[in-house]
């Protein structure tokens, strides 16, 4: 559209010529520009400069685009007397672009009235310079590296706590299984709700679930309710309510109270929270449940074959994840995914601390809730050493931990600690015990190998963890009931546990992952072993995966070997054929299927058919069908699965919602820090962050999963804009705090687009450079070219334009217009003419 406009103007050619000659002087004839009316000042044009004013420009800092915004330029003169345009940038802007403004107090406003003209004096930074490239609409800044903050460091003043809003995430699943032999059926239902409230820097969060299976009645359970906020000057965070103690020094415990600790996400060199990946193999369509500290935190339905769940968000507690896979035929398998905590190693001068006071919060309502307290401190010493100490206390338990960690350079990080604990189980005498722990982790950059190892050695039978001791105290009953309360509470009998995770990139030959864990107990309790080997390979557009998993639980060993292959059909990447082979304890399964996506990956589908050989289901077949939709307002999916003995139907729905001052906005689940995209009145627009998420009919959408305390570019896809909408500035930057919902607001001009030739009542054309806009609406102002033509957007069907080429009454006029279908071209552009009075 704009290319069409250029064809009607010759000023573009003049601009290009002046750009080529640089600073060379040249002259315009005012009579040629304004048809004999020389009231327009062209002295600046004659010297190769443009008129002062406000321009939408790209700001380029040391070769990188850092912003696109309106900048005001005023006229200045060089020492030689040559006029030029000087930008008016603020200290806040320079700080936002990465300049260390606090190191240069002379930057403060260069103009006399600093309140109305807060322009900085860029000359205060030695060797700093600027150049306004008018014809590229670029303000090019050159600032020495010494004047910039370290990469990744962002001033606190730029952190955005976002808007006040109520938010809700929801997940729901219902499945019904029919047993063909006896005609019976079993229904299972599950609802997970995550309501929240953002109020300034405060974040209020809750997790509540309801589950029901078979003849058992439904049960509600609240995993946590808490309020938290950042204390930015201390780079810390305070939490009030129900949460979990950190698991870096002691085993994590759920508590109700107050917690204050540092927030590493606020540090420039932050290390993001570890999020484990849960891998396993389902023999049939199965329900996967994941618990942590006794609380159900995740539930989903997976198809037969290997599964990999990377969207499991733990409680940040450091406690292991207990995974249970419920097969369609009633069988189940269980295993533990260790929540690996990296070695404790800090840089010199870095401090990490955490303070907790409150009461124990067990998942079982029968367990007592005594007061608990915990304090931990770690500090980075010289020589790459880290010292740390911690204390954990309750009515029946006291433990002290101390250790030393070190950064070993190219050899990774290592830490070792010893914990002395005094424990008193219910109706038993106090006992003392010690435990040693060694942690090691390393990433080999050259070979792209990651390795982590955790070894805990319990040297005496008197050592126990706090949660195991407190679980033995019930509000009713007597005796040592710990095994009845939590079958996994065996720290008193645990002698040694070790876990290791190795990841190896093989380049074009794929990726190999190995995870292993072993728990050894005293007495008759058998050891638990878990080993998984996973290999993935991409060959062209096909995908190959080989997995071997062994879980030893009690006296039973489960060994599962799986091979999966996916190959695109017909050269298209949205439809695949698949084959899967699974071998488990003497039985073999072979499955073929097809799956794919459509409608920009919004629709997903799969059809699978399997044959089973070996006991007990030799010769049996099974099949499944799945259909899912990932929409702008949420996700929905349906599943059908059958075998000779059962038929199962299930449905899933999930999504998120935000209530804000402009109303209700629906979307997919809100994952942590988010942005509310605002394009008022324009629906169906996406951003480059996620092409699947479109603005609703009011022009709003939710984009989540942003990293806190980091800058993000939110860019509109202009191809999605309807013909009657135009957005001058299609990108904006946001820098949210943890859990914030920040605004990315865009200002569309909605209405018709027109090229209008404007003449004055005396027959003269409008002076070149005049501004034309709707009366009382300067946002859609257009510049009149030398032929009196102006390109206008956002026009209503009828209206009045104000044309100005000066401040005096004789330097402005008004023109009425009315859009007519006869004046509309094939491209949707109206060709208008009008007389300005």
Curated annotation (Swiss-Prot):
The record's subcellular location field reads:
Cell outer membrane
Write the signal peptide boundaries.
1-23
Membrane topology category: Multi-pass membrane protein
The GO cellular component terms are: cell outer membrane
Q: Which UniProt keywords apply?
A: Cell outer membrane, Fimbrium biogenesis, Membrane, Signal, Transmembrane, Transmembrane beta strand, Transport
Annotated GO biological processes are: pilus assembly
Q: Cite the GO molecular-function annotations of the record.
A: fimbrial usher porin activity
> SUPFAM superfamilies under this entry?
FimD N-terminal domain-like
Q: Which PANTHER family match?
A: F1 CAPSULE-ANCHORING PROTEIN, OUTER MEMBRANE USHER PROTEIN
Q: Describe its function.
A: Involved in the export and assembly of PsaA (pH 6) fimbrial subunits across the outer membrane.
Q: Which family does it belong to?
A: Belongs to the fimbrial export usher family.
Q: What is this protein called?
A: Outer membrane usher protein PsaC
